[in-house]
């Protein structure tokens, strides 16, 4: 029985991957470097911020951790300056979250920075519905390693009784790396269509068109989930 829903953030709750890409390219161009959208999809979605920047630099033939830190600092600065005005959330995001919170405990396990996640959730009025937020500073091994999701479950278990088990957690993801992480954690997984085709999402238990698909009766029947009140 599903008792908890663990969300990725970028591409699931927020339509933010394009903004991340634009900010990264802006920072790279200041260094005389570049990255295509297809390259970004290949190596930068669903992974921690440091790993994404490191991958982008290696793609440009650069292997320098000091430069990774500098590009990440600049990319974060640019992204944060755009956050309030340009970042859009998934359609009906707040409504979906409030509906799910009636029956399940919720958490976020993301490769983004905590302040970026909290700023958006606060803006949308749902921050208090996520007792646990795991961000890129909370772990060393990011997705596709299962650590982010297992850590989110562990932190939920600090105030849930009986403790959650992996098979009682439903992960909502949009990237192959995130789906792999959920699988390795022994958790169920729903994939939201965003920037990848269904072939790339095939290892998920269920695929939905958008976040609103989490409220479909067909999905609830598939996972034998408790009906909404």
Residue ranges and their predicted role:
Residues 29, 100-101, 183:
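Anion (oxyanion) recognition and catalysis
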Residues 81-108, 114, 118:
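Short, acidic loop-to-helix structural element flanking the phosphoryl-transfer center
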Residues 21, 25, 49-54, 114:
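An amphipathic alpha-helix signature
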Residues 1-3, 94, 114, 118-229:
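Asp-based, Mg2+/Mn2+-dependent phosphohydrolase catalytic module
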Residues 33-41, 61-71, 128-129, 161-166:
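Short, surface-exposed acidic
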Residues 1-42, 202:
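Active-site neighborhood of HAD-like aspartate-dependent phosphohydrolases
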């Amino acid at each position: 029985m599903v008792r908890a829903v663990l969300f990725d953030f970028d591409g699931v709750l927020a339509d933010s991957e394009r903004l991340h890409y634009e900010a990264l390219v802006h920072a790279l161009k200041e260094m005389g470097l570049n990255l295509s959208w297809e390259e970004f999809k290949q190596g930068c979605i669903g992974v921690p911020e440091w790993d994404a920047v490191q991958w982008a630099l290696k793609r440009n033939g650069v292997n320098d951790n000091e430069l990774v830190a500098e590009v990440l600092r600049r990319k974060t600065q640019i992204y944060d300056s755009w956050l309030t005005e340009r970042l859009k959330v998934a359609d009906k995001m707040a409504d979906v979250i409030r509906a799910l919170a009636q029956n399940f405990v919720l958490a976020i396990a993301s490769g983004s920075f905590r302040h970026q996640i909290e700023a958006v959730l606060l803006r949308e009025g749902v921050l208090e519905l996520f007792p646990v937020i795991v961000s890129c500073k909370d772990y060393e091994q990011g997705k596709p390693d299962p650590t982010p999701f297992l850590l989110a479950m562990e932190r939920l278990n600090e105030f849930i009784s009986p403790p959650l088990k992996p098979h009682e957690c439903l992960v909502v993801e949009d990237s192959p790396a995130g789906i792999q992480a959920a699988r390795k954690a022994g958790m169920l997984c729903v994939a939201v269509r965003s920037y990848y085709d269904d072939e790339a999402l095939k290892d998920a238990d269920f695929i939905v068109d958008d976040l609103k698909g989490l409220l479909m009766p067909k999905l609830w029947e598939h996972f034998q989930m408790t009906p909404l009140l």
